[in-house]
Amino acid sequence: MHMADALISPAVGGAMWAVSGGLIAVCARKVKQTMRDNLVPMMGVLGAFIFAAQMINFSIPGTGSSGHLGGGLLLTVLLGPYAAFLVIASVLTVQAFFFADGGLLALGCNIFNLGFFPAFVAYPLVYRMVAGGRGGAFRNWAAALGAAVAGLLLGALGVVLETLASGISRTTPSAQI
């Protein structure tokens, strides 16, 4: 789900920009070190697909946020976590700048919530443990389902924690916001 700028304070937004920027730098370095011939074209094609799929938004009433299909886990399974994080960061940046999906202040939060949790938590701790390289259609299906649910729930938890850290809630009187 994309966070709107109204959900976070400038301090939290700035901190998450710094965290996400640091992750982008680390991922770019890792991708450069392990570059394969077909990686960049795959990143481009899959990025375009995820961009189109994520443009189908579902409004979340009363929050100013929207939810959509999450492409982070699919990218991670197909590209690996470092390349996937770079692609999802690129997709989210284009969506924020050109389509006002999310907000510029919240872009760091959105990159972290939609990129970090699927690529670096759900994929290694759920998908790889369940699928385990042993194959089998049911095992892969169960691993993908479990990791997708974990990634989405962790992303939603990230939104809650970032909003809480900002001191913005529905119970806050509007004069204080």
Where are these regions (language model features)?
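Hydrophobic transmembrane alpha-helices
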Residues: 2-10, 14-75
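Membrane-helix interfacial "entry" motifs
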Residues: 2-9, 31, 35, 39, ...
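Hydrophobic alpha-helical transmembrane segments
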Residues: 14-15, 40-45, 70, 85-89, ...
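Membrane-water interface at transmembrane helix exits
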Residues: 25-32, 53, 58, 95, ...
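Alpha-helical membrane segments and adjacent membrane-interface helices in multi-pass membrane proteins
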Residues: 54, 58-118
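Short helix-perturbing small/polar motifs within transmembrane alpha-helices
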Residues: 114-159
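A structural signal for small-residue-enriched, beta-sheet-centric alpha/beta enzyme cores
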Residues: 148-177
